[in-house]
Amino acid sequence: MSQGHRSEEVVRVNLLFFAKSRELVGTSSLDNFPLATSGGHLSGSAVLGTICERFPELVAIRDSVIIAHNEQYCEDLTEPISLADGDEIAVIPPIAGG
């Protein structure tokens, strides 16, 4: 094993989709979604990128969605998120109102 490399760890999270994201992917939730992390950590941007790889329909709204980790908004997607099996990741597009 090379020095300086963190071990890759796969965690399984539960995804929740709201509003437009739910319409695009055709479901409101998906359990046991695998995320490859670096020692249990992954940036919000990488989490969203992995979700968009699995659900390419979301690419159209990727730049406007917010993600939440265990009901806490991830305001800075460059920050690492500490992830564990069973955590909840919500994909929340902007809600239009009138």
From Swiss-Prot:
Sections of the chain in a coiled coil: none
Gene Ontology molecular-function annotations: molybdopterin synthase activity; nucleotide binding
Keyword Phosphoprotein among UniProt keywords: yes
Residue numbers of Glycyl adenylate PTMs: G98
Residues annotated with 1-thioglycine modification: G98
Top-rank taxon: Eukaryota
Pfam family, one: ThiS
GO BP: Mo-molybdopterin cofactor biosynthetic process
Entry keyword set: Cytoplasm, Molybdenum cofactor biosynthesis, Nucleotide-binding, Phosphoprotein
Transmembrane segments: none
Alphabetized SUPFAM superfamilies for the sequence: MoaD/ThiS
Recorded metabolic or biological pathway in which this protein acts: Cofactor biosynthesis; molybdopterin biosynthesis
Subcellular location(s) of the protein: Cytoplasm
PTM comment: C-terminal thiocarboxylation occurs in 2 steps, it is first acyl-adenylated (-COAMP) via the hesA/moeB/thiF part of MOCS3, then thiocarboxylated (-COSH) via the rhodanese domain of MOCS3.
Entry-linked InterPro entries: Beta-grasp_dom_sf, MOCS2A, MOCS2A_euk, Mopterin_synth/thiamin_S_b, ThiS/MoaD-like
One term under GO cellular component: cytosol
PANTHER family found in the cross-reference section: MOLYBDOPTERIN SYNTHASE SULFUR CARRIER SUBUNIT
Misc. remarks from the entry: This protein is produced by a bicistronic gene which also produces the large subunit (MOCS2B).
Family: Belongs to the MoaD family. MOCS2A subfamily.
Biological role: Acts as a sulfur carrier required for molybdopterin biosynthesis. Component of the molybdopterin synthase complex that catalyzes the conversion of precursor Z into molybdopterin by mediating the incorporation of 2 sulfur atoms into precursor Z to generate a dithiolene group. In the complex, serves as sulfur donor by being thiocarboxylated (-COSH) at its C-terminus by MOCS3. After interaction with MOCS2B, the sulfur is then transferred to precursor Z to form molybdopterin.
Subunit-structure text: Heterotetramer; composed of 2 small (MOCS2A) and 2 large (MOCS2B) subunits.
Protein name: Molybdopterin synthase sulfur carrier subunit
Species whose genome carries this gene: Aedes aegypti
